[in-house]
């Protein structure tokens, strides 16, 4: 049992006594805190000792399905093909490129002429944690700006590599964040710094060959609700400085050919108006929710006068379709949309005067699947690179000729061991929420796993930040399916699966809708005979961990086991403290309990930590990261301590803290697979499922998606997983 030291906090005439507030130490290296976390780790290891053989078996299965030595699909940018390689036994990818042969549009097929840009295994050395943030070449492709984090705290050190020699230049910049851009002169580099609360708030300019101390501060975002980012338009003509809160945005642009010039605003910020842009032939295409376009619309404006007074509708608002983003090509406009809860891609012909031609949605092979944009850095191309996956179809990369509508499969994620998709079935079920809304559950199971109240079911949820949990493939998950599990995703409100209103109906003073939707999905699965409470497990991470914690308090008898990864569970404590990382940004998501007594009372009503009661809770596995800047370690640590002291059952309650990592968990792929094996072993043991896969599944069948290439996008928001 953890030591109790009651401390009180008063807000809106309400006093809260917290016996474990001492765990929120000023220094995460506080000896007592570390001793407690290490003791919990030891307890978890001892409690899971009976599953050690099962964990090894699961790890072997997960690893055995992976083509460990593999190659990502090369991406053409300018005179080079870019790709990443993985090697058997190596934790991290190796980022490479090869020169493109003039007139040959085919991707390279061997290693002849390969140039290693960055070998993460070499750079990581003996570091317990290693993550790459920036990976950005100059327009002439001679210098690579790259950054690394060796703690998991998401503070990156920026370096610059001469790609001809393979050596890093003397320039080095510590304390940077996500977001970079190069000027057209190949010498001027823009980067972002966070403040002490980890809010990215300053744009800086560096010139190659100079000291970081000589760098120029270009812009500071003074509004604590906003974070700052930088990038370039696809044609690399404009640098784009973006400032965003949860509900409002503003963009400034600067000609990349004039990198020391002054950024100019596109449209000044207006509360609750969001927009983002791309450049095309002296015009900006702008995705926005202005003028009541709840699900967003597309407008255009001249690049020299891009303000709202000059916006012209291109694709009007559609209540049934959410416009999530766009890509632009010389002769085509690509719209990334969401309809009926699923992602789709629409291709629109584009005339020289920006006139729209015929449009069509790219056909997909299954009723329940997910299409997503790929890496498309080339503006003058008629070929769209995109990805597709479903819960039974491994991640697939296609090239799509937007004129002929012909698609070419470039690669499907290899699943070793004889995986046969026909042995599995994916489907959608429709659960009725308390207020009559319909929640579309995505499910996958073995084809021979029929409806059965004894079936073990794992129900996953998130439900915050308008993030969407799409039905995609996981080869690791096969280890559960082959043991008879049914896996289901509950896309509850607060997420973005069904459009913008789906999000707004699950935030602020409607946050409890997220939890009631999730419980409605659980009740539906039970009522329809798919499982029973003792065989129903739930899982969620970060804000999804809040979901898990809240529903365990509201209906602990509804679930047979739970996994909460880096869970956001000390909600009131975190959101009251404006000095904590990212808190002020979060007020537009959760509400501001400092100013509003109504928000405070509502938030306190669902806070997982404050609503623990002396009752039985199901077996629970909780994870944390000592260096986590998004959900600090003390949130899951306090939650577990209070649960252990209060609950009345003897069910397992386990806390596993990564002592050298942050929010994203361990950085190496083998370490991540071992963590997944631990979670699966816990679920199998807690639900009393056979530890052996059913031989009727056939031979045991890469874990997650293929390694992202150098043009991967930035990570999600503050409490996202």
Show the residue positions of the predicted features.
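Beta-propeller blade signature
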Residues: 97-99, 159-163, 204-209, 253-256, ...
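Hydrophobic beta-strand positions that form the internal "hydrophobic ladder"
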Residues: 81, 144-146, 189, 239, ...
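Cap/lid segment of the alpha/beta-hydrolase catalytic domain
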Residues: 117-138, 147-153, 164-169, 402-406, ...
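A flexible loop/linker signature enriched in serine peptidases of the S9 family
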Residues: 86-93, 124-129, 148-157, 172-175, ...
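Long hydrophobic segments that form regular secondary structure
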Residues: 221-310, 314-320, 324, 332, ...
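Non-catalytic accessory segments flanking enzyme active sites
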Residues: 31-136, 147, 226-279, 324-325, ...
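Active-site-proximal cap/loop segments of hydrolase catalytic domains
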Residues: 489-703
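Blade-edge beta-strand/turn elements of extracellular beta-propeller
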Residues: 114, 120, 162-175, 210-222, ...
């Amino acid at each position: 049992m953890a030591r109790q030291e009651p401390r009180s906090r008063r807000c809106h005439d309400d006093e809260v006594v917290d016996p474990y507030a001492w765990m929120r130490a000023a220094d995460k290296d506080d000896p007592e805190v570390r001793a407690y976390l290490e003791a919990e780790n030891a307890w978890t290891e001892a409690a899971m000792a009976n599953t050690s053989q099962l964990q090894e078996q699961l790890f072997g299965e997960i690893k055995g399905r992976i083509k460990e030595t593999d190659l990502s699909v090369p991406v053409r940018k300018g005179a080079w093909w870019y790709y990443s390689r993985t090697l058997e036994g190596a934790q991290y990818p190796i980022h490479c490129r090869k020169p493109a042969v003039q007139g040959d549009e085919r991707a390279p097929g061997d290693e002849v002429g390969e140039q290693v840009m960055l070998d993460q295994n070499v750079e990581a050395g003996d570091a317990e944690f290693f993550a790459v943030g920036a990976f950005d070449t100059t327009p002439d492709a001679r210098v690579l700006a790259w950054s690394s984090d060796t703690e998991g705290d998401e503070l990156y050190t920026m370096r610059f590599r001469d790609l001809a020699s393979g050596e890093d230049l003397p320039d080095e910049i510590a304390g940077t964040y996500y977001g970079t851009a190069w000027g057209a002169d190949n010498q001027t580099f823009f980067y972002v710094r966070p403040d002490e609360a980890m809010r990215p708030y300053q744009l800086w300019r560096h010139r190659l060959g100079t000291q970081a101390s000589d760098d120029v501060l270009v812009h500071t975002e003074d509004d604590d609700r906003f974070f700052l980012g930088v990038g370039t338009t696809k044609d690399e003509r404009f640098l784009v400085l973006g400032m965003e809160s949860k509900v409002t945005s503003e963009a400034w642009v600067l000609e990349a050919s004039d990198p020391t010039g002054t950024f100019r605003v596109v449209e000044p910020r207006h509360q609750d108006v969001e927009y983002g842009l791309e450049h095309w032939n002296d015009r900006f295409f702008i995705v926005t929710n202005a003028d009541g376009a709840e699900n967003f619309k597309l407008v255009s404006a001249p690049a020299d006068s891009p303000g709202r007074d000059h916006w012209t509708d291109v694709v009007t608002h559609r209540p049934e379709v959410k416009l999530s983003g766009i890509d632009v090509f010389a002769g085509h406009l690509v719209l990334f949309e969401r309809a009926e809860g699923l992602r789709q891609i629409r291709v629109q012909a584009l005339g020289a005067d920006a006139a729209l031609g015929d449009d069509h949605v790219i056909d997909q092979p299954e009723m329940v699947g997910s299409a997503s944009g790929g890496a498309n850095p080339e503006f003058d191309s008629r070929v769209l690179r995109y990805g597709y996956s479903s819960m039974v179809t491994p991640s697939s990369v296609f090239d799509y000729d937007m004129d002929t509508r012909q698609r070419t499969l470039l690669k499907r994620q290899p699943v070793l061991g004889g995986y046969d998709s026909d042995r599995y079935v994916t489907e959608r079920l429709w659960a009725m929420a308390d207020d009559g809304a319909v929640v579309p559950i995505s499910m996958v199971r073995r084809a021979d796993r029929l409806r059965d109240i004894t079936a073990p079911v794992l129900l996953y949820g998130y439900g915050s930040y308008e993030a969407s949990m799409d039905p995609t493939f996981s080869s690791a998950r096969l280890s559960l399916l082959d043991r008879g599990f049914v896996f289901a995703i509950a896309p509850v409100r607060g997420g973005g699966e069904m459009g913008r209103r789906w999000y707004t109906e699950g935030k602020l003073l409607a946050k409890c809708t997220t939890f009631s939707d999730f419980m409605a999905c659980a009740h539906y699965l039970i009522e329809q005979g798919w499982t029973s409470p003792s065989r129903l497990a739930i899982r969620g991470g970060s804000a999804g961990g809040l979901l898990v914690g809240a529903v365990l308090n509201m209906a602990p008898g509804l679930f047979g086991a739970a996994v909460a990864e880096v869970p956001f569970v000390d909600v009131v404590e975190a959101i009251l403290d404006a000095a904590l990382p990212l808190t002020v940004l979060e007020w537009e998501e959760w509400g501001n309990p400092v100013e509003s007594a109504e928000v405070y009372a509502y938030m306190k009503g669902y806070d997982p930590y404050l609503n623990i009661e002396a009752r039985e809770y199901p077996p629970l596995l909780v994870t944390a990261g000592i260096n986590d800047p998004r959900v600090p370690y003390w949130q899951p640590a306090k939650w577990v301590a209070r649960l252990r002291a209060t609950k009345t059952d003897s069910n397992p309650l386990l806390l596993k803290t990564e002592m050298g990592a942050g929010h994203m968990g361990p950085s190496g792929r083998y370490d991540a697979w071992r963590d997944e094996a631990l979670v699966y072993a816990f679920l199998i043991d807690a639900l009393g499922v056979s530890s052996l896969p059913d031989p009727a599944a056939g031979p045991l069948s890469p874990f997650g998606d293929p390694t992202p290439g150098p043009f991967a996008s930035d990570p999600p928001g503050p409490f996202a997983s």
